Amino acid sequence: MEIIIHQAILHVLDTTMDAPVLSGGGMEMTAEKTAYFQYHIEKLLASDDIRQCRPLPDSAFKNELEHNHDFVDLSCRIAGVLFDYMHAHTTIPVADLAVVDFTRDGEPWLGILKLNYKNGYTHYTETVEGAPVNSIIQQRACLPSQSGKVEEGALVNLTDYSMKLLEKKFDIDGHKDFYLSTVVFQYTTAQPEKKKLQAIQEAAVQAVQENYADQPHVEAQVAMLIANQAADNDNQVSIQQVRQQLEEEYPLAAVPFDDYVEKSDVLEAPEQPVTVTPARIRRMESRSIHTANGIEVKIPTELLNSENEVEFLHSDDGSISLLIKNVIL
């Protein structure tokens, strides 16, 4: 994946003031600033808390994207809408808004990063009786660090206006609700990627367990199946791919899997692939086994059914012992 930053602009949305401080032009893009935005965009793209959203028919935001090709003016309009809503609902964290024009693998994208303020500390020096005295002072408007996390943001694919959205619920007029998707952007609110992945896994596990009752470690085997597909397909997996794999390895589970997917209220658009983050793929590639006294053993998922490597011994009292073979000390 190649991310190229073309331009970026920053607006100050401090709701302790009556109006936003809107920038009249884009910032000069140094290597440090480019690296900062690249990092946070890549981190958003890899997050499984992201929501895949589509514009509603009357989305003013999408209409603005289609007809306003002035980057600075477009960013100011987005900042204005966001500030007005934040100013009316002060439970929403104050922030700076970075709007970033970038390409991802050659396609045009627009990044909208709400950089919520963090408290931080720095040194300051004052003169006391003619001598310098160093101390620390709290800064209440620190932006997320380069290794930190952007808590709210949207990445818009300008070829079809689809959106990858990271949003949080805040107390709005007495109840917790989203505001970016519903008010600022007027986009659909889809389920996060990790919930979609969980729904696919659960459907596959149920289908296999019902038709292959004697098959051990079904959850681990399904996780490995999905992890392998994601690793081979640019961190994405589709329901159709999972079904094809089930049809090859567990043919009796394919049709029940279809039924579970159809009944799911999480998988609203089964034809769309689900993003699986590299961190989640790594977790799916092994299983942690814990004993009652706190010992933890991590076993690669692909070895769980290999009796040449590990063996699970079932005792009459219902307990299970783990025999690990070919140990090298």
Name what the model sees in each region.
Residues 2-280:
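Long, hydrophobic alpha/beta structural blocks
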Residues 244-329:
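C-terminal structured domains
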